[in-house]
Amino acid sequence: MSFWNSLSITTRYSRLPRCFFTYVQPTPLDNSRWLIWNSELAKQFDLPENVHNHSELLDAFSGETVPSVFSPLAMKYAGHQFGCYNPDLGDGRGLLLAEIKDKKGNSFDLHLKGAGLTPYSRSGDGRAVLRSTIREYLCSEAMAGLGIPTTRALGMMTSDTPVFREGYETGALLIRMAETHIRFGHFEHLFYSNLLEELKLLSDKVIEWHFPCCLGEDKPYLAMFNNIVDRTAYMIAQWQAVGFAHGVMNTDNMSIIGQTFDYGPFGFLDDYEPGYICNHSDYQGRYAFNQQPRIGLWNLSALAHSLSPLIDKSDLEKALEQYEIKLHDYFSQLMRKKLGLLSKQEGDTRLFESMFELLSQNAVDYTRFMRALSYLDSQDKQTVVDLFVDREAATLWIDLYLTRCKLEVDSFDMRCSKMRKVNPKYVLRNYLAQQAIVKANEGDFSDVKILSTLLASPFDEHPDFERYAELPPEWGKRMEISCSS
C-alpha cells in the first residue's frame, strides 16, 4: 500500500457536476523545497511530523507527482468585488487536491496555492510569490493561535522559479487546509448563471457536509442560512475584538462556514485607529477596520439574494435582521472577557465605547493597552496611564473600570490571569511580517520560523523574544499592503 493510500482521503467535491469546477494538473516550480512544515497540524491528520524523510510529501505537494487518490481541480465561483458583481472568478492560482480526515473523522480540504495556470487565471500567471505566501502562512497560524476561526497552513515551499509582479520575485507554494473552500461566491455563480438545480444541489451538499444539524429542520435551507449568519457574525466580532482588518472582504473571500479566508492585504491595528485601511487599493475605505461589521451584513445580503429561489424573502429578511444583534452580543461577550468581566451589567457598552474613544483620541497601541490592562494594579495605575497623552482622562477611565471590576466575584489575581489568556502579547504586525520577508528573500528564514512559533502561543510571555512585542517603528505603522500576490 502506498503512503497516500494509507490515509483517509476522499474527493467529494469532484463528484459534483462539471459547472462547479475544471480538472487541472498542477504545474511544478523549479527546484521546489520545503521552507516550513507545520508539524503540529500534521499530527492531527496522521501525517509525518518531519517531512525530510518523506519524499512522497515533497513530490505530491510540489506537483511533481500527483498521487492517484488526488483529483486536482480548480473551483468555479463568482462574487462581488468592491460592491460590483464579477462573473469571471474562480481558482486562478490554487487547486483543491483532495480532502483528508483528521483523527476525529472531520474532513479538511487539501489546497495547493500557487499551482499554476487554470481556466480561471484571467490575466494572471497562476503563481504565488514568496512574500504573499509567508504572509498567509503566518497570519493563518496567528489567527489559529488567537482562537479565531480560520483556514490553516500545513506548509510552504520556496523554489528557483522567478515570478514577475512589480519586479521579479520568488515563486512559492502554500498548502492550505480548510473545512471547506466553498465561498459565498459559489452560490452567486450558480444563481446569476440561472443554474437553479445546481444551486439546490450545492445547498444540499453544504447541509450534508457542513450543517447536518439542519437536515431535520422544517426549512433546512433557511436553517443553513441562519447558521451562516451566526458564524459570520461570530467571526467578524472576533476580528473587531482583536483588532484585525481583513482588507478585501469581497464575497468571493467569504467562507460559508465563517472561517477567515484568503489572507491578502490584511493588518492588525497598531495605534487604535477605527478607520484604518490596510489595503492600498481600497481608495474609498470600503473595507476599513470599522466598516467590517457593515460589510459582513452587505455580503450576507448578497448571499441571501442568491438563495432567494430556495428561501422565502420574508424568512431571509428576518435572518438578516439577526446579524447585527448576534454581532453585538458576540462582541460584547468578547470584550467582557478581555476586560476580565464575567457578569453582564448595565453600563458595560458605554464603558467599552468610552475606552475605544480614549484609545483613538490618544493614538494608543491597541494590543499593548489590552495586555497592560491585564497586569493593572489598583494601587499602581501608572504603567497603563503612561500609555496615554491625556493622563487625566486615562485615570478617570481606569477608575471607572476598577469600580466596575468590584462587581465581579473573581479576585484581582484570578481576573488578571484570565485576561492574560485572551489578550495576546504577540500579534502579526505588518512590520514584523515585512522584516521576515526581507530576510527570507535573502535566504534567511529565521524570523519566519520564530514568528510561526510565537504566534502559535501568542498569550505566553516568551521572555527571550520581547523585541517581537515592541511597538512598531514609525515606518511600520499604518502600513498599506498590496493585493499583489
Swiss-Prot record:
Assigned EC number: 2.7.7.-, 2.7.7.108
Pfam families (UniProt xref): SelO
Region forming the signal peptide: none
InterPro entries reported in the protein's UniProt record: SelO
Keyword terms: ATP-binding, Magnesium, Manganese, Metal-binding, Nucleotide-binding, Nucleotidyltransferase, Transferase
Superkingdom as given in the UniProt entry: Bacteria
Binding site for Mg(2+): 253, 262
Active-site feature positions: 252 (proton acceptor)
EC primary class: transferase
Cofactor(s) needed: Mg(2+); Mn(2+)
Disulfide bonds: none
Molecular function terms, GO-annotated: AMPylase activity; ATP binding; magnesium ion binding
Reactions accelerated catalytically: L-seryl-[protein] + ATP = 3-O-(5'-adenylyl)-L-seryl-[protein] + diphosphate; L-threonyl-[protein] + ATP = 3-O-(5'-adenylyl)-L-threonyl-[protein] + diphosphate; L-tyrosyl-[protein] + ATP = O-(5'-adenylyl)-L-tyrosyl-[protein] + diphosphate; L-histidyl-[protein] + UTP = N(tele)-(5'-uridylyl)-L-histidyl-[protein] + diphosphate
UniProt record similarity statement: Belongs to the SELO family.
HAMAP family: YdiU_SelO (MF_00692)
UniProt cross-references to PANTHER family, sorted A to Z: PROTEIN ADENYLYLTRANSFERASE SELO, MITOCHONDRIAL
Record's function text: Nucleotidyltransferase involved in the post-translational modification of proteins. It can catalyze the addition of adenosine monophosphate (AMP) or uridine monophosphate (UMP) to a protein, resulting in modifications known as AMPylation and UMPylation.
Descriptive protein name: Protein nucleotidyltransferase YdiU
Gene: ydiU
